[in-house]
């Protein structure tokens, strides 16, 4: 089983990304999802209503307090959820773990996630990639989402591309408009090639 951690600020598109990925990959792979919310099961409920996955393949973890603690310093609640999911479905090939909405410094504990995808969005401005932080600089894949909003918020995608290249060096990044399913195929290809080590 490959565990893929997905984190990023509130509203960047993490839940929508997971919903799109499960829709694209469900027929070919055995999938499951763990979501993290501070005080509610909101993301888990959204996934249950909108995902192609049955609700028993989705676990919502209520982290309380700081969401980044539950994915890094004290990942015990999430590790228990991983264990529970493996007991329910021993055949799981990909487990997506969504962090609670957090800032640019959120990262996953290596024992919780094998790979990390960090999602930011254009609406936060074109300066976000150059601000750096562990998510932008060290994640295995950076997704710059909501590219359709660039003209409305005055964000320059060329500047974002330049800064992402500079901050990430050789690490990959992708531009997406998840709501319109733009760029999702490229994310699926990245997962197949780098996380599942498939020859595409």
UniProtKB/Swiss-Prot annotation:
Residues at which GTP binds: 8-15
Subunit description: Homodimer. UreH, UreF and UreG form a complex that acts as a GTP-hydrolysis-dependent molecular chaperone, activating the urease apoprotein by helping to assemble the nickel containing metallocenter of UreC. The UreE protein probably delivers the nickel.
Assigned GO CC terms: cytoplasm
Species the sequence originates in: Helicobacter hepaticus (strain ATCC 51449 / 3B1)
Gene3D superfamilies referenced in this protein's UniProt entry, alphabetically: P-loop containing nucleotide triphosphate hydrolases
Keywords, ordered alphabetically: Chaperone, Cytoplasm, GTP-binding, Nickel insertion, Nucleotide-binding
One annotated GO molecular function: nickel cation binding
Compartments where located: Cytoplasm
Name used for this protein in its record: Urease accessory protein UreG
Disruption phenotype: Cells missing this gene do not produce urease; addition of Ni(2+) to cell cultures does not compensate this loss of function. Normal amounts of apourease are produced by the cells. Has no effect on hydrogenase activity.
Alphabetical list of HAMAP family matching this protein: UreG
UniProt xrefs under InterPro entries: CobW/HypB/UreG_nucleotide-bd, P-loop_NTPase, UreG
Pfam family, one: cobW
Domain of life assignment: Bacteria
Transmembrane segments: none
Protein family: Belongs to the SIMIBI class G3E GTPase family. UreG subfamily.
CDD domains: UreG (cd05540)
Role summary: Facilitates the functional incorporation of the urease nickel metallocenter. This process requires GTP hydrolysis, probably effectuated by UreG.
One BP term from GO: urea catabolic process
Major localisation: cytoplasm
């Amino acid at each position: 089983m490959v565990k893929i951690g997905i984190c990023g600020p509130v509203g960047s598109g993490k839940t929508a990304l997971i919903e799109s990925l499960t829709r694209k990959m469900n027929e070919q792979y055995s999938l499951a999802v763990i979501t993290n919310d501070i005080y509610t099961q909101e993301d888990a409920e959204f996934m249950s209503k909108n995902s192609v996955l049955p609700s028993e393949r989705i676990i919502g973890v209520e982290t309380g307090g700081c969401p980044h603690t539950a994915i890094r310093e004290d990942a015990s609640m999430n590790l228990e959820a991983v264990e529970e999911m493996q007991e329910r479905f021993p055949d799981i090939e990909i487990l997506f773990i969504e962090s609670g909405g957090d800032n640019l410094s959120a990262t996953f504990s290596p024992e919780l996630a094998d790979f990390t995808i960090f999602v930011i969005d254009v609406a936060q401005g074109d300066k976000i990639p150059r601000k750096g932080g562990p998510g932008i600089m060290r994640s295995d894949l950076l997704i710059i989402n909501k590219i359709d909003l660039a003209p409305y918020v005055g964000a320059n995608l060329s500047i974002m591309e330049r800064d992402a290249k500079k901050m990430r060096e050789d690490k990959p990044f992708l531009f997406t408009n998840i709501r319109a399913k733009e760029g999702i195929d490229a994310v699926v290809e990245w997962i197949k090639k780098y996380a599942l080590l498939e020859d595409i």
